[in-house]
Amino acid sequence: MKKLLAALLAMMMLLACVTAAMADEGSEPDWTAYDALISEVKAETDFAAREAKMHEAEDILMATGAIVPIYYYNDLYMQKETVDGIYANLFGFKFFQYATVEGSDTLRLNLASEPDHLDPALNSSVDGACLAIASFGGLYTYDAEGNLKPDFATGYEMSEDGLTYTFTMREGLKWSDGADLTAKDFEYSWKRAAAPETAADYSYMFNGIKGYPSDLAVTASEDGATLTVELDAPCAYMLDLMAFPAFYAVPQQAVEGIEGWQENPGAWANEAGFVTSGPFTLTDWTHNESMVYTKNPNYYDAENVKLEKLEFMLSADDTAIYAAYQAGDVDFIDSVPTDEIQNLKDNPEFHLIDNLGTYYVCFNVKSDLFAGKTVEQAAAMRLALSKLIDREYIIDTVGQCEQKPANAFIPEGMADGNGGVFKTNDDAYTYPDEENVGYYGYDVDVEGAIELLKEAGFEFDGEMLSANTPISFEYLTNESSGHIAIAECIQQDLAAVGITMTIRTCDWNVFLDDRKAGNYDVARNGWIADFNDPINMLEMWTTESGNNDVQFGR
């Protein structure tokens, strides 16, 4: 334990070094060094040096204690035996366009409750990405084996220095209203998504393109047949970006045809009937109840789309969702009540699939919880609370789906961009907890937590927090039995040493808005990688990122 405590203290010293340039005293880490390091990673052309910089970035991130990994994701779903052809990938994307339902031309399903955004540039949720895939398209996509393949493009050419890509568009592409879809639509869409005034959460994903954010070096040919993209540095995951929904095309005429579109850029897709380009169009939307997607006859591969309709039940109540599935009202669901999982594991309709991501708890670094503390003391508080969480218990009693406990933010199995796996000990890098290949062990460590809290100025009577120095905060989560059960486990773990945690549950959209705005102390969170490179899970914490829910640098 002493060895691990020393490693944690060393992490806090690292945090102290990177925050030494702070202009004002306070508990928030200065994030200038982290932002600069991510920029260096994006510009680095030596793969080994790039990997080293990404490890350095994760070291800084984990030293704050603001990210508390709980477990590494996998995914579950239930599918009637009459359904075939649905596929998913490591990034949580689900593809329904080639599904079939025996004896029916309609697939009835549930993914989530009311979506936050249907504009692919503004979406930031996995469920929203699945809806975007059903109704829009990008230059590339994924096949059933998880491999990249051309979609609205037919291929590309890359310059010898890796800095220029020229994509050739598929001929005859149409929007759902019959208008031509060309490279000019992609030029417009990317520049819109990157522009500060659009305020897209994923705008930072365009920052490897020259001219980001306001003068993106993306140019369509005069005839709209090709799209040329100029990069600041070679990008090994360029084609992965081409398959990501933020890079999908949206119709300029529809986007800008809504009154007040400048102030509300996603308003054009807030009701059924908006123009799409993918296999389906949204034709009916009863908000907070249901959505109906109908086959798009103008989709370039419409002849291979066998379904006529997708009917979505909108709900986050997994008890109601499972009841609907049992009653035969839906054919596909991807959540079930926690207390049903063990009974379902031998059911042939129950499926587990791999994901590349991390379920975690995040702290708002601007919370009053850390008022009066130094940067190092605030980090010690957060790291201490992490050591009190029984991850194995959460997995065994709540997750129950063979998840693995997490002790680093970057998940197991993620590539390192240099021909290997990132989360491993090797000659180039060794994790602080070498034995467990992470930043700390998996076991609850009450003694270590108490030592860290004492470092942060808290007093103890034995193993209980003294009434002289109480800790009390609120935990934010959305309305889902699994997420609430995890919150209750953490609440119990912290209560064992006298820490008071109350739980606030909200519906999905309120939860997202409050977490994004920093209206919380501690919140449940999770990130499934958008592509297989650590930079995806590191650049989301830059000051400018729309996914920086922790409020680093703000």
Region roles according to the model:
Residues 30, 56, 149, 294, ...:
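Append "and occasionally in soluble cytosolic enzymes with long acidic Gly/Pro-rich linkers
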Residues 69-71, 77-78, 91-92, 110-160, ...:
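N-terminal lobe/hinge region of extracytoplasmic solute-binding protein
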Residues 24-80, 218-220, 383, 395, ...:
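Extracytoplasmic/peripheral linker and loop segments enriched in polar/acidic and small residues
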